[in-house]
Amino acid sequence: EALGLAKKAYLPSVDLYFQWNRATRNNTFGLVFPGAGLPSISGPVVDAASTQGTFGSVAAALVRWEALDFGVRSAGVREAEALRRRAAAGTRWTEIEVSLGTTDAFLGVAAADSAVRAAAAAVNRMDVFTETISALVASELRPGADLSLARAELARARSELIRSEALRERARVDLAEWLGRAGERVEIEATELLESSPATEGAPPNAAVPHPLAELGEAERDAARARRDVAKGAYLPKLDVLGAVYGRGTGAALDGSFEGGAEGLWPERTNWAVGLAVRFPLLDFASRQETKVREHLEEAAEARYEHAVERVASELGRARLHLDSARRIAENTPAELEAARALQVQARARYDAGLAAILEVAEAERILRRAETEDAIARLDVWRARFEVAAAEGDVSPALSELQ
């Protein structure tokens, strides 16, 4: 709408004017400065003044077109276009932020689910182990201290499960808020996500579409330049083309008599006129100072644009580094998990054979639970890093398509 309004400045203005009045016709010689609301009168001076009134009417069509403005209107159009691009870029960036926030909240719930499953598995293993030790202690095959330590580890595992469940509920609340469903309970199914990973080489970004942050900076710079040009043209001459067609009617005659009746209600005398007018604000020093201010604002906008370009490049570099490290960690955690599972089995076997203390079993259980959690989180972190790269590239559509 603002762009269309700016373009309409090129069109001529056409005003229609109608007036009816009833007034006296007394006139005199002399000059009076025009004042607001002070009526004017035309016609010869008649010696005999009269208080009698008569009808008068005016009908006119007035045309004015600014033929030359030294680029002021074109600068206004450029400013409106830049503001339109800024609004569009702001909308795109908001959409990216919402998509990234929603995805991050979803992955947070998935990670919390994985942590809950790992904690629940640890509780089950320690529960079974504690029952076994209880039987051994009852048979006086193990010291009572082992049972106390096993129960302490079981209680610690249950506390970890409670904390994990609380974190999962908080993550669900965050996801519901991003989805616009605050107050509702949100359930997700992330099994397929945990079993997959994004493509090694994601779909290339659309090079024809700039990053919205860079486009925002560019649009603000262009708008500042346009405002500078508008300020420059404010104190330059303006050339107007003028035209008018108008008619007047009156019930007063040249000799001072009155025709009476309805005479004067209809315009009887018509005229036309065309002309050129030049306007030059000779002493408009404020506009010249405004130009200097606009030039400084343009320099500031240019600096912000360059900073935005650098920021986009830096964010993309950091996101790609995150994705690379996340992939390598996800490739390493399965080996860590396999070793932790083997350690847990071996520690349990050594304890059952009387070759290891219960502390070794407890430590193996903690290592296994941590490895199970880290393995799931590592795979989810690859997806999180993939979306960070997509956001840094300015288009999350390719990353979203990989989820489908």
Report residues per predicted region.
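Sec/SRP-type N-terminal targeting helices
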Residues: 7-8, 53-56, 67-95, 149, ...
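Periplasmic alpha-helical coiled-coil/stalk elements that build and connect Gram-negative outer-membrane
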Residues: 95-210, 322, 326, 349, ...
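Small/polar, glycine/serine/threonine/aspartate-rich low-complexity segments that form flexible
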Residues: 17-62, 192-197, 229, 242-280, ...
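Coiled-coil heptad-register positions
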Residues: 7-10, 14, 95, 102, ...
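Bacterial Sec-pathway N-terminal export signals of envelope proteins
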Residues: 1-20, 25-28, 66-67, 75, ...
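Acidic, low-complexity, intrinsically disordered peripheral segments
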Residues: 22-24, 365, 372-404
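Short flexible linkers and secondary-structure junctions
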Residues: 1-108, 238-239, 243, 286-287
